[in-house]
């Protein structure tokens, strides 16, 4: 199960945070700080999986953004690594080469995309085409 998803820049500013387990506000800030500290200084030749408390964080860096997913210790790392890539591909489709400012100014759309393929902390949809079609239908309604 996914515990949380964080999108952070190199400076540690959180651009998107989605929690699937209840945490106090102070604990969320602490988690965001710790995850950033874990991933920002890791060498590129290391794996994209790192243990975090009693869970593990799977992360991927795209340009200046770190996409981090915290999951149970027994979950499949590669499935979540690919889901991060799927998320970025879908963002690229909607924002034509997504950048940090797209996430800041269109956060509502980013959350909608995320909700299309992750439900209650579990991967629900892995088809890029299906997600893009659903998002296109939602855009027609607006």
From Swiss-Prot:
Q: Which CDD domains match?
A: AP2_sigma
User: What is a single molecular function from GO for this protein?
Assistant: clathrin adaptor activity
On whether Cell membrane is a keyword of this UniProt record, the answer is yes
Note the topology in the membrane.
Peripheral membrane protein
The protein's matches in Gene3D superfamilies, at most eight in alphabetical order, are given as:
3.30.450.60
First-listed, main subcellular location of the protein, grouped into a coarse class: membrane
Domain of life assignment: Eukaryota
Keyword match Endoplasmic reticulum: no
Q: What does this protein do?
A: Subunit of the adaptor protein complex 2 (AP-2). Adaptor protein complexes function in protein transport via transport vesicles in different membrane traffic pathways. Adaptor protein complexes are vesicle coat components and appear to be involved in cargo selection and vesicle formation. AP-2 is involved in clathrin-dependent endocytosis in which cargo proteins are incorporated into vesicles surrounded by clathrin (clathrin-coated vesicles, CCVs) which are destined for fusion with the early endosome. The complex binds polyphosphoinositides.
Tell me the protein family, please: Belongs to the adaptor complexes small subunit family.
Q: What name is this protein filed under? A: AP-2 complex subunit sigma
Gene name, per UniProt, is: AP17
């Amino acid at each position: 199960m996914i515990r949380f998803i964080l999108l952070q820049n190199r400076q540690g500013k959180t651009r998107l945070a989605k929690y699937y387990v209840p945490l106090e506000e102070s604990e969320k800030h602490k988690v965001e700080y710790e995850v950033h500290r874990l991933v920002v200084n890791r060498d590129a030749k290391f794996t994209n999986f790192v243990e975090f408390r009693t869970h593990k964080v799977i992360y991927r860096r795209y340009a200046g953004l770190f996409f981090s997913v915290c999951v149970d210790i027994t979950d499949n790392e590669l499935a979540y690594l690919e889901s991060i890539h799927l998320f970025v591909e879908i963002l690229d489709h909607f924002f034509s080469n997504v950048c940090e400012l797209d996430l800041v100014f269109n956060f509502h759309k980013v959350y909608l995309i995320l909700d299309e393929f992750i439900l209650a902390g579990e991967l629900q949809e892995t088809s890029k085409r299906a997600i893009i079609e659903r998002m296109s239908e939602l855009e027609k309604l607006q």
